Amino acid sequence: MNSVGIIGFGRFGKVLANILQKGFSIKAYDLKSTGEFPGVDFVDLKNILKEKVIFIAVPIRHFEKVISDISSQLSEGITIIDVCSVKNHPVEIMEKYLPENVGIIATHPMFGPDSFMSNNRPKMMMNNTRDLHNQFSFWRQY
């Protein structure tokens, strides 16, 4: 895996891109993004869904719609990683909509765009909801 996708490129999506660029090429999709961010390739939804790992970085109020909209378009073996600030609700949504052959890693970032900019030290709580292909271990170490 040499690239990852990010759906949602607001403040937190940009922080994710900064963190992940150290090890991956980044593809991003956002309805409102201008498509300009150093080192990020902006693609349409169809192309972002080809990535093996996709981070969902949308506001919680849009989370269920995004997950339900993409669920039927995901290929077997893809892993979805959410970065919502709450856990029960996103996990329930992902388990409800995502096929059994799609991995799920629920995370709770212990930083935000402002705190990351001040100390540049990301820390995440992670829940191995549905691990496929040992993705949880990989991302826990990253």
Q: Each predicted region: which residue ranges?
A:
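Active-site beta-alpha loop architecture of Rossmann-like, nucleotide-cofactor-dependent enzymes
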Residues: G35, R61-E64, K87
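ADP-ribose/adenylate-binding Rossmann-like module
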Residues: L74-P90
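Rossmann-fold dinucleotide-binding core
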Residues: V86-Y142
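Rossmann-like NAD(P)-binding element
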Residues: L45-Q73
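Hydrophobic/aromatic beta-strand patches that form the interior of the parallel beta-sheet core
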Residues: K27-Y29, V43, I81, I105, ...
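NAD(P)+-binding Rossmann beta1-loop-alpha1 motif at the extreme N-terminus of oxidoreductases
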Residues: M1-D44
